[in-house]
Amino acid sequence: MNLAWKEIKFYKFRFILIMFIIFLMAIMVLFISGLAQGLARENISIFDQIKGNQFVVQKMKEPQLEKSILSRSKQDNISKIIDEKPFKMAGKTFKINGNEENVMAINSVKNHQPNLKSGHYPKNGNQIAINEKLTAEGLYLDDKVKVKGDDTTYKVVGILKNTMYSHSNIVMMDQSKIEQSSNVATFYVTNQLSKSDKNKINHIKGVQTATTDNITSNIASYKAEQTPLDMMIISLYIITAIVLSAFFYVMTIQKTSEIGILKAIGITTKHLLTSLILQISMITFIGVAIAEVVILLISQILPVSMPFHIDMHNIIIVLVIFMIVGLIGTSLSFIKLIKIDPIEAIGGGQ
């Protein structure tokens, strides 16, 4: 540890340069990760909010909430098995400041209501709660809004916290208003579903159970967006490993004579390797930590309309991966350090 720290202080400019490179790479990875998470949440954040992991929907090859049509008789049969009220979902077009905004309207179901950022849930047919992203369109608490094809003027009484489905903002409104639409989807959400109840539901003609993963995997935009973004993140990790490998390998070559002298005076290869690992770990940790602080600060000032999300889970994962990638990327330096002969390094072989 002492040797590693002394070398960092002696070659501080060199190590600051590497730390800066790590900082830039971490910024890129974190920002793209934040965008990937943000885009993902615009497709599936409703599932975090409605507090359920089992769904009862219309039987279909690729279950999708907005396509789940359940007749009254099927709903009656389902209600005999699970003690849950159904969700109703329909597309609506809001008129906001002269512009049209397509949204997904859902009703309020006890124990499965999305979290509120401010205000309260609708209490009558003239009230609505909107997703927070709609505030970027100029819609706020107590504002009035019209819906295309509906004569009712709605009052915004609540702001929902990050609730979206398939890139559509979720708006909570009275069930009777949703059922006025031509295509109304019906589905059930539950937390607990026994094997027996699941079998009973699946035996109802035209009805099936589905997990959150079943539903999200069939959202076309979710699948289309995540794969290329994930590949970009993986590519950045590979580039990071290559860059760090080049930097540390060149540094090791430049220090060949110093390493040879240290070996000649009795410093073991194990001690030198430990010193190198500590150097890599320290500058990688500091570089990534600074990048994470910067990204967290940036995330606080980004507009709500921008799909960006970063949390402690992402922060920890990026830090751990960078530490691992940093060590893997410097494996060539380990090999070079082990092979350095003290006599040749200090010119004794000539």
Swiss-Prot record:
It is found in: Cell membrane. Keywords: Cell membrane, Membrane, Transmembrane, Transmembrane helix, Transport. Disulfide bonds: none annotated. InterPro entries: ABC-4/HrtB_transporter, ABC3_permease_C. It comes from the Bacteria. GO terms for cellular component: plasma membrane. The chain crosses the membrane at residues 15-35, 233-253, 276-296, 315-335. It is a multi-pass membrane protein. The keyword GTP-binding does not apply. Belongs to the ABC-4 integral membrane protein family. HrtB subfamily. PANTHER family: ABC TRANSPORTER, MEMBRANE PROTEIN, HEMIN TRANSPORT SYSTEM PERMEASE PROTEIN HRTB-RELATED. Part of the ABC transporter complex hrt involved in hemin import. Responsible for the translocation of the substrate across the membrane. The complex is composed of two ATP-binding proteins (HrtA), two transmembrane proteins (HrtB) and a solute-binding protein. This is Putative hemin transport system permease protein HrtB. It comes from Staphylococcus epidermidis (strain ATCC 35984 / DSM 28319 / BCRC 17069 / CCUG 31568 / BM 3577 / RP62A).
